[in-house]
Amino acid sequence: MKISREKWSSNFSEWFDWVISQAEIYDYGRYPVKGSGVWMPYGFKIRQNVTTLIRKLLDETGHEEVLFPLLIPETLLKKEAEHIKGFEKEVFWVTHGGEDELEERFALRPTSEVAITLMESLWIKGYSQLPRKFYQIVSVFRYETKATRPMIRVRELSTFKEAHTVHETFEDAARQVDEAVEIYSKFFDILGIPYLISRRPEWDKFAGAEYTIALDTIMPDGRALQIGTAHHLGQHFTKAMDYKVQRADGSHVHPHQTSYGISDRVIATVISINGDDHGPILPPVVAPIEGVIIPIPGKSEEDTEKINKYAMEVESVLKNSGIRVALDASEDKTPGEKYYIWELKGVPIRIEIGPRELNSGTAFLKRRDTLEGKSVKREELVKEFRNLEDQISADLRKRAWEQFKERVKRFQSLDEAKKFLENRGGIAEVPWCGQDSCGLKIEEQVQARVLGTPLKPEPSGNCVVCGKPSTNILRIAKTY
């Protein structure tokens, strides 16, 4: 069955606002603080399932969860000059306690490098304690002056997962950056989110980093969205705070650090990437409800009672197998109205129970992504349900990657790249000599943002600015 995606693709911003509101995911714009939204119960469960997944991946790789204070003293935040220079205009400051002006301002955490470095210096004294990997999932605050967008560009990032690690050598920290990228790649693969991995250019790396690796996806409107970053911090913060560890030979050295993060943008992408005009299509792994049971009334009240009883038995079978399932037995809506509501919420599988299913001892399973259905015997229900979930997950992932690859194109001229980005959107790749000056000219002439270069150099023709042989390709895109 062909499902319309016209609204989803042609007016994505309006579609997204409609979905998060009507599906009761995220209430944005009505809380009286610009750039802040409220996670509603259904949306919070999506968020919870996403954070449960990343926690599992981090815990499995030796990361330890911590929780740091929200407030950071100004003197501490300014310890690393390059870092604060990159964040200063985005910081929210607490200046008063009650009616009293504070002697020192406190920042609402924009990120936690300096705060965590301080505590690492108190906890970790020698090589035998290294490496050490910490993470937390918290709110961070950024004073966004541009137009805000729910989950994508907000002043309070309420689902900020930041990991911070400390190492004896530069090389060990570099390996940790590689591990971070592997963790994120696995995370996004499970969620069915396609991505490109790029090394950010020098002028756009994280403030206080040696280098930054980023993962970007493409949203339905053709704009690229940064969904994960990993930074090699070198010794910038440990030198700024004069933090040293003892080595095996008795000497002392400033340790090397990394940090890497994801945010609410991941949830925005999960909601958006496989949507259609009916609403989102949630992958089973993060769907609050994997299956919804809709009883279809019979011709008589007695038949309807039997159908409802059978629907409750089906619910019990699925729940006892660990499947997140809901039974919509509400009497004030028709089956068609219920279909609309649960499709809008993105529930992966609908289970229809009517007179036919009651008489044959079956259930009718309908996929949210294709709206195709099949009848299954009750004794095979759990197995068939799980198989269908696996198929849905695989098909969503395949479709998302196919859409993504169609929107990544390589060009030999800036004019072609600019035309592509203006007409279709996506990510354009052009030959680049490696000089910052040429990279900045590309940004200026195309009026788009440079995302960076592939991790393995891919020389291709001559630089589109100066004409010299390229050392790599440069990825450019319209962004949020």
Curated annotation (Swiss-Prot):
PROSITE patterns: AA_TRNA_LIGASE_II (PS50862). GO terms for molecular function: ATP binding; proline-tRNA ligase activity. Coiled coil: none annotated. It catalyses: tRNA(Pro) + L-proline + ATP = L-prolyl-tRNA(Pro) + AMP + diphosphate. InterPro entries: aa-tRNA-synt_IIb, aa-tRNA-synth_II, aa-tRNA-synth_II/BPL/LPL, Anticodon-bd, Anticodon-bd_dom_sf, Pro-tRNA-ligase_IIa, Pro-tRNA-ligase_IIa_arc-type, Pro-tRNA_ligase_II_C. Its EC number is 6.1.1.15. Homodimer. Catalyzes the attachment of proline to tRNA(Pro) in a two-step reaction: proline is first activated by ATP to form Pro-AMP and then transferred to the acceptor end of tRNA(Pro). This is Proline--tRNA ligase. The lineage of its organism: Archaea, Thermoproteota, Thermoprotei, Sulfolobales, Sulfolobaceae. The gene is proS.
